[in-house]
Curated annotation (Swiss-Prot):
Signal peptide: none annotated. It comes from Talaromyces marneffei (strain ATCC 18224 / CBS 334.59 / QM 7333) (Penicillium marneffei). Associates with 90S and pre-40S pre-ribosomal particles. This is rRNA biogenesis protein rrp36. Keywords: Coiled coil, Nucleus, Ribonucleoprotein, Ribosome biogenesis, rRNA processing. Residues 115-147, 270-300, 320-333, 341-357 have a biased composition (Basic and acidic residues). InterPro entries: RRP36. One of its GO terms (cellular component) is 90S preribosome. Belongs to the RRP36 family.
Length: 357
């Protein structure tokens, strides 16, 4: 019974203290939450009545338990005390108003924010030593660069850029060793000089490639007539050359020199004869083209007729004999007859030996 009385006294003292604290908190919050306290008070009165009834019932139960369990150990008393404490705490929570809860929640949020700020400050303080390490590393790196001479070059380049007003390209880094291959840019500086007016140059003139004579390889035939007219004096030179060779042949008595002069005369005459034949061919073709064009204009033909090689050769011979005199024509015909006869004899088969007898 003595233990139960002591426990009851302690519980009552605690309840009185808690009621005093609740009254003090209610007085503080009465000015701020007047409207909300009316509903809270009605709820709190009901909760207080319930708590009082629960307390009375708990006291009766405690008395009965004390009478029945007076001889229990101290461990049982402690368990009872903890249960009573829980019930008291629950009753206290029931008596707290909503305004007090809202105010407490706001105060807890502010405390949390202050705690986060304190944590961030501590984190920055933790980072400070790492920043000092970075500073030390940066100083070491700068010292190494100064040893290599990079910092001086960069400073000079920066000064030049600031003075000139534009940024120049940084110099390439030095080689790792003297045996390393040298790096050379493939870019070549373009000269700033520009030729606005080209100077007049003396060009050599070659008549073989003169545009007045030959414009292109495809237009050689068209320009032959103009070339012949331009170099017609060469025909006179050739004729005079043949005449001089013949005079020398008549005057010389040396056999070897005569043979050389005869060969020179025959080569010159053959060359002249070939040029004359080409000239006749061109004349025949020009005459034929004119006739065909005239017939087409008159409407007698729709398409031109192109001569064959055999027909062209026949027409050239015809024109050649027409241009000759009677004596020259007879001589030429005789030479031609002999030439054809010799060819026919070569083509004939060999005669048999028995046929001769």
């Amino acid at each position: 019974m003595a233990i139960s009385d002591a426990l009851n006294k302690r519980l009552r003292a605690r309840r009185d203290e808690e009621e005093e604290e609740d009254d003090f908190e209610d007085e503080l919050l009465s000015d701020e939450m007047e409207g909300s306290e009316e509903d809270g008070r009605s709820n709190s009165d009901e909760e207080q009545e319930d708590s009082n009834s629960d307390a009375a019932e708990s006291e009766e139960d405690d008395d009965q338990d004390d009478e029945q369990d007076g001889d229990e150990d101290l461990s049982d008393a402690q368990s009872i005390q903890s249960a009573n404490d829980r019930e008291a705490i629950q009753s206290e929570f029931r008596q707290i108003s909503f305004g007090a809860l809202a105010k407490a929640q706001n105060s807890i949020g502010k405390k949390r924010k202050r705690g986060a700020e304190d944590k961030s400050d501590t984190r920055t303080d933790d980072k400070k030593p790492s920043s000092t390490l970075d500073d030390i590393r940066e100083r070491l790196r700068k010292a190494r660069e100064q040893k290599l001479g990079l910092t001086n070059n960069n400073n000079n380049n920066n000064n030049q850029n600031n003075n000139n007003g534009y940024h120049s390209k940084p110099k390439p880094p030095p080689r790792s060793s003297k045996h390393a291959p040298a790096v050379q840019s493939s870019k070549v500086a373009v000269s700033r000089k520009r030729t606005i007016i080209e100077p007049t140059t003396v060009k050599s003139r070659d008549p073989r490639f003169d545009p007045t004579v030959v414009k292109s390889s495809s237009s050689v035939r068209r320009n032959n007539s103009s070339a012949e007219n331009a170099y017609s004096f060469l025909d006179e030179y050739r004729a005079s050359e043949i005449k001089q060779l013949k005079e020398q042949l008549s005057k010389t008595k040396d056999a070897t020199q005569k043979e050389e002069l005869k060969r020179a005369i025959t080569s010159a005459t053959d060359r002249q004869r070939a040029l004359d034949n080409r000239k006749r061919e061109r004349e025949v073709l020009q005459e034929h083209k004119k006739k065909e064009k005239q017939l087409i204009k008159e409407g007698k033909k729709s398409q031109p007729y192109f001569l064959k090689k055999s027909e062209l050769k026949r027409e050239v011979l015809k024109k050649k004999y027409e241009s000759m005199g009677s004596k020259e024509r007879a001589k030429a015909l005789e030479r031609r007859r002999k030439k054809v006869a010799s060819k026919e004899k070569k083509d004939l088969p060999w005669a048999r030996r028995g046929m001769e007898n």
